[in-house]
């Protein structure tokens, strides 16, 4: 999954460059695939936070909950400030682990930096999903990419947007030729957007 690359980009940024966020899937949706590898984030990314990101802290209150995703959705333990970058990451999955959503939030010092981070993000997504970015009507600079993974082992739906000072990366992984339903993706993205919008302090 793309957490490692995102955080590597973040730590290489100056104050005007930003990272993004990522997610893991639901049980009630008809997506179908083996889970993504979000736990490698902190070990693979630099521990020096870029100047454009916020102070390290507990940002888990900004995440959506398993109840927001679906009835039989399980929640992995949140990873605080993965890779030494301000934010939080978590993976949701159904009980059989065939559908996952990886949710990564990266917190910046200001909304302009976060918006630029979301705008720059599509250039790095080709490593994780094969498809052309399309506009996505959530947050600022929202995009969505739907397609197979480069190795054709799973279907991937990747969503990126910013909300205020936060960049949200949501990655929905499922079985080959069984992409997450678009209405489900939109619902999860809106819930995450609302959570950030209502819980972020200025």
Predicted regions and their residues:
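Short, surface-exposed beta-strand/loop micro-motifs that present aromatic residues
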Residues: 86-94, 155-163
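A short acidic-to-branched-hydrophobic micro-motif
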Residues: 89-116
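N-terminal "mature-domain start" segment
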Residues: 14-91, 141, 175, 182-202
């Amino acid at each position: 999954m793309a957490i490692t690359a995102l955080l590597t980009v973040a730590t290489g940024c100056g104050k005007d460059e930003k990272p993004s966020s990522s997610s893991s899937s639901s049980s009630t949706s008809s997506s179908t695939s083996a889970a993504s590898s979000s736990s490698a984030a902190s070990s693979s990314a630099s521990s020096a936070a870029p100047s454009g990101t916020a102070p390290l802290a507990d940002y888990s209150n900004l995440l959506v909950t398993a109840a927001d995703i679906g009835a039989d959705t399980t929640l992995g333990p949140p990873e605080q400030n993965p890779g030494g970058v301000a934010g939080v990451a978590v993976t949701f999955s159904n009980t059989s682990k065939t559908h996952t959503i990886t949710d990564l939030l990266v917190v910046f010092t200001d909304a302009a930096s976060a918006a630029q981070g979301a705008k720059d993000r599509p250039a790095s997504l080709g490593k994780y999903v094969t498809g052309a970015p399309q506009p996505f009507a959530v947050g600022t600079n929202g995009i969505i990419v739907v397609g197979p993974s480069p190795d054709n082992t799973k279907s991937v739906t990747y969503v990126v947007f910013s909300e205020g000072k936060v960049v949200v990366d949501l990655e929905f992984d499922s079985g080959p030729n069984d992409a997450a339903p678009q209405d489900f993706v939109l619902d999860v993205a809106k819930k995450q957007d609302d959570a950030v919008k209502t819980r972020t302090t200025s």
